[in-house]
């Protein structure tokens, strides 16, 4: 490194990635007037020599923390007074259950309770009094659902519930005052780094087709994950009788099996898509880092709702953006269980305030409270999923600052009804000015492949490479525009991650138009390569060193290359804002 006698100045990164104009051309790091060492963070020094980046890291001193008693019956929300077990809920008298949670005993499906009752009164018999619904959760109903909603007498809902509500919800109100400051900018390395960009997924026998949605469950009594083996085994799912199962059963079975097998696969660094996963994770850090907005009200916490949280791969990102509360929901019960255990293993023990100064966040730990539930956000309302085990949570923590749906929203495009339920949950959960951030397959990328007839040899309905493939169940339209926009299925394969699971095309303009109908306006949309190219100079020194090193190309530069580049180009990132 050439020394500078005129003083030390900060190193600047002028190019770390390959732009679209340069194609696969290698990128470089340039420096100007630098001293031998430039301090980037409190625990990291960076040296720049001959446009090559070299990082030396000084480990901080370990913080003493009290060991957790393994015999303690931990709850899903560590140190959080919002947990309630299924047994406790079932022991409550029927009067304590909110009316919107009730279901008819003989209901054939989850929507029967919204069908108007047949009037079997005898002539002259007085009609049962109908009253207004609980106004706290009415906003989660679409207008057509509200018109058909069963109404019940006041005393059935308001009696005991009103008496117990203050002590339940006050706990959440108190938590809203407990925000923390001084969030460090660097993404920390938790005990278990993210395991990829997909939600993961249980045994085939436990997920028969056409079952009802899985109820929310607490996970304090479930076993922890087993240790991985030394050798790596590529993932393969085994879903019997797949052609006769609905999309929910297939997705749940796939990601349940993915969760179980991932514990025995071996070191994730040996995965054939290790670099691709790191690239996708880096893009998610950039999206959330740019678009999670703090609550403008003084003293209010930053709350994130992850509507398809998988195994908790985005918990590190919640810490990265300085979240105070995190709510994770997923259709796979095995994934939710794993997410809870990941959070519990890496949860920080809060540093007490000293002399009126707020304690620094430990970026290697989760300095936020979290709760997890199993449910289908594309068919159930958020209160239906959360309130059975966390009474008062919707009124206490909502509306939230950010709703995140990563690599999973395309499953909702099976039907218009599922999309509208999903968007209704998003819009009603967000505060004005809050953001909806997500990643989906790019309909523009799919259309270009179809129009250019860029199919695999011998096929007219399949494209991809050795890492990924997209196979339509029928020949796609020659112009690449799908009509109608819902239910256009294809099987997606990603080596060591997704094993030919049915997905659906998301025509982005249709999606954008439906978002506008619920008060969400588009603020950002770019494909993954564009996001990485634009944001990596800003985030290079903020991201965890292992994550950055995991994106190193064969030529020593950073970014996606070869088959990985095409695979990540399949996706785009977006951000919508909730209008006030």
Curated annotation (Swiss-Prot):
Record field: transmembrane: none
Biased segments, Basic and acidic residues type: 54-67, 102-154
Function: Responsible for methylating the 5'-cap structure of mRNAs.
S-adenosyl-L-methionine in keyword set: yes
GO cellular component, one term: nucleus
Assigned protein family: Belongs to the class I-like SAM-binding methyltransferase superfamily. mRNA cap 0 methyltransferase family.
UniProt feature, compositional bias: Polar residues: 1-17, 25-53, 69-90
Binding, mRNA: 280-281
Alphabetized Pfam families for the sequence: mRNA_G-N7_MeTrfase (PF03291)
A molecular function (GO) term: RNA binding
Reactions this protein catalyses: a 5'-end (5'-triphosphoguanosine)-ribonucleoside in mRNA + S-adenosyl-L-methionine = a 5'-end (N(7)-methyl 5'-triphosphoguanosine)-ribonucleoside in mRNA + S-adenosyl-L-homocysteine
InterPro entries the record matches: mRNA_G-N7_MeTrfase_dom (IPR004971), mRNA_G-N7_MeTrfase_euk (IPR016899), RG7MT1 (IPR039753), SAM-dependent_MTases_sf (IPR029063)
Organism: Meyerozyma guilliermondii (strain ATCC 6260 / CBS 566 / DSM 6381 / JCM 1539 / NBRC 10279 / NRRL Y-324)
Residues noted as binding S-adenosyl-L-methionine in the record, renumbered to the chain: 284, 308, 330, 376, 406, 411
Regions annotated as coiled coil: none
Site note mRNA cap binding, residues: 311, 317, 342, 410, 503, 571
Xref: CDD domains: AdoMet_MTases (cd02440)
EC number: 2.1.1.56
Localization in the cell: Nucleus
Name used for this protein in its record: mRNA cap guanine-N(7) methyltransferase
Disulfide bonds: none
Region annotated Disordered, chain positions: 1-222
Keywords, sorted A to Z: Methyltransferase, mRNA capping, mRNA processing, Nucleus, RNA-binding, S-adenosyl-L-methionine, Transferase
EC top class, as a word: transferase
Domain mRNA cap 0 methyltransferase, first and last residues per copy: 271-579
Biased composition, class Acidic residues, residue ranges: 191-214
Nucleus listed as a keyword: yes
């Amino acid at each position: 490194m050439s020394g500078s006698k005129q003083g030390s100045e900060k190193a600047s990164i002028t190019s770390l990635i390959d732009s679209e104009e340069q194609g696969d051309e290698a990128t470089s790091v340039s420096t100007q007037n630098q001293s031998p060492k430039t301090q980037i963070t409190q625990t990291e020094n960076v040296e720049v020599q001959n446009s090559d980046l070299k990082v030396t890291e000084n480990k901080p001193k370990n913080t003493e923390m009290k060991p957790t008693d393994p015999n303690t019956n931990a709850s899903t929300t560590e140190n959080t007074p919002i947990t309630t077990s299924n047994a406790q809920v079932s022991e409550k008298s029927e009067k304590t259950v909110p009316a919107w949670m009730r279901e008819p005993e003989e209901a054939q499906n989850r929507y029967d309770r919204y069908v108007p009752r047949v009037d079997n009164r005898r002539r002259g018999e007085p009609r049962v009094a109908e009253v207004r619904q609980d106004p706290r959760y009415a906003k989660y109903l679409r207008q057509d659902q509200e018109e058909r909603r069963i109404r019940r007498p006041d005393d059935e809902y308001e009696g005991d519930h009103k008496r117990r509500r203050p002590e339940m919800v006050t706990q959440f109100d108190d938590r809203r005052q407990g925000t923390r400051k001084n969030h460090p900018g660097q993404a920390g390395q938790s005990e278990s780094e993210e395991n990829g960009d997909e939600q993961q997924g249980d045994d085939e026998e436990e997920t028969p087709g056409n079952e009802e949605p899985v109820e929310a469950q607490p996970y304090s009594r479930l076993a922890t994950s087993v240790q991985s083996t030394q050798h790596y085994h590529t993932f393969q799912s085994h879903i019997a009788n797949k052609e006769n199962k609905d999309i929910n059963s297939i997705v749940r079975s796939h990601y349940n099996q993915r969760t179980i097998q991932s514990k025995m696969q071996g070191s994730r660094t040996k995965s054939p898509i290790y670099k691709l996963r790191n690239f996708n994770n880096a893009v998610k850090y950039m999206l959330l880092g740019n678009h999670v907005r703090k609550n403008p009200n003084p003293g209010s916490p930053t709350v994130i709702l992850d509507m398809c949280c998988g195994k908790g791969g985005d918990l590190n990102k919640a810490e990265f953006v300085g979240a105070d509360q995190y709510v994770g929901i997923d259709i796979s019960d095995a994934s939710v269980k794993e997410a809870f255990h990941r959070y519990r293993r890496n949860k920080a023990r809060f540093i007490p305030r000293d002399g009126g100064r707020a304690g620094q966040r430990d970026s290697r730990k989760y300095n936020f409270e979290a709760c997890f539930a199993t449910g289908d956000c594309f068919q159930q309302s958020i209160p239906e999923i959360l309130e059975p085990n966390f009474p008062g949570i919707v009124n206490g923590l909502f509306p939230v600052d950010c709703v995140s749906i990563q690599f999973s929203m395309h499953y909702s495009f099976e039907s218009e009804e599922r999309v509208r339920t999903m968007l209704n949950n998003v819009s009603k959960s967000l505060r004005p000015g809050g953001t909806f951030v997500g990643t989906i397959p790019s309909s523009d990328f799919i259309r270009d492949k179809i129009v250019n007839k860029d199919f695999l040899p011998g096929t007219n309905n399949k494209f991809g490479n050795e890492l990924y493939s997209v196979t339509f169940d029928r020949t796609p339209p020659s112009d690449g525009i799908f009509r109608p926009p819902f239910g256009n299925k294809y099987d997606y394969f990603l080596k060591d991650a997704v094993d030919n699971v049915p997905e659906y095309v998301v025509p982005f303009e249709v999606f954008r138009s439906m978002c506008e109908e619920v008060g969400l306006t588009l603020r950002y949309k770019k494909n993954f390569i564009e996001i990485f190219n634009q944001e990596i100079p800003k985030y290079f020194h903020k991201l965890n060193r292992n994550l950055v090193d995991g994106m190193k190309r064969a030529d020593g530069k950073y970014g996606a290359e070869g088959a990985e580049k095409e695979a990540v180009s399949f996706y785009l990132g977006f951000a919508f804002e909730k209008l006030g």
